[in-house]
């Protein structure tokens, strides 16, 4: 590979393009309506498959690659599409480090890695906590089940898929 991009990133790009072309090809071969009806019937399985693929391939929409910029490294390392955004400091300086720090404290309710005294981590939107109340924050389950990196992929992909499916269901109800 002549560019600075890694082979895994190129493989992920290839797979994403291949899947898009496969969907278009199937729609051309079988017709848009039958494929659309099949996708409608299997929308939850397709959504779960998208989440599983993102977790397995470790794909997230995080701008955590900005840390490479601040540390003087190539910012595009391991970026599949787009560029890390400097404006997203709320995510890559605050939210994601708080979520990742929880793995070092065993996902405890209080974490003393930030500040001079233990902080209540359940009150933080992005911090997973190993507690019964975490049942009501399902997007954090990925951190607890899969660890920090794949948990971040689950956090991003599950929120997007659930938002899309909820909007789809809403439009089905009002139409």
Kindly give the residue locations of the regions a language model identified:
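Short, strongly hydrophobic alpha-helical membrane anchors
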Residues: 1-7
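Active-site lumenal/periplasmic loops and adjacent helix-entry segments of GT-C-fold
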Residues: 67-175
């Amino acid at each position: 590979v002549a560019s600075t991009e890694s082979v895994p990133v190129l493989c992920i790009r290839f797979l994403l393009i291949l899947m898009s072309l496969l969907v278009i090809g199937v729609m051309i071969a079988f017709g848009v309506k039958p494929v659309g009806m099949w996708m409608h019937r299997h929308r939850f399985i397709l959504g779960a498959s998208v989440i599983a693929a993102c977790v397995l391939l470790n794909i997230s929409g995080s701008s955590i690659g900005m840390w490479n910029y601040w540390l003087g490294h190539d910012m595009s390392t391991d970026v599949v599409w787009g560029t890390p955004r400097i404006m997203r400091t709320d995510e890559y300086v605050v939210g994601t480090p708080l979520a990742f720090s929880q793995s070092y404290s065993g996902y405890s309710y209080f974490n003393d890695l930030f500040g001079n005294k233990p902080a209540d981590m359940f009150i933080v939107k992005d911090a997973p906590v190993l507690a019964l109340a975490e049942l009501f924050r399902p997007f954090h389950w990925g951190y607890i089940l899969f660890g920090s990196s794949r948990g971040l992929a689950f956090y991003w992909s599950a929120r997007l898929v659930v938002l899309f499916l909820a909007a789809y269901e809403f439009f089905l109800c009002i139409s």
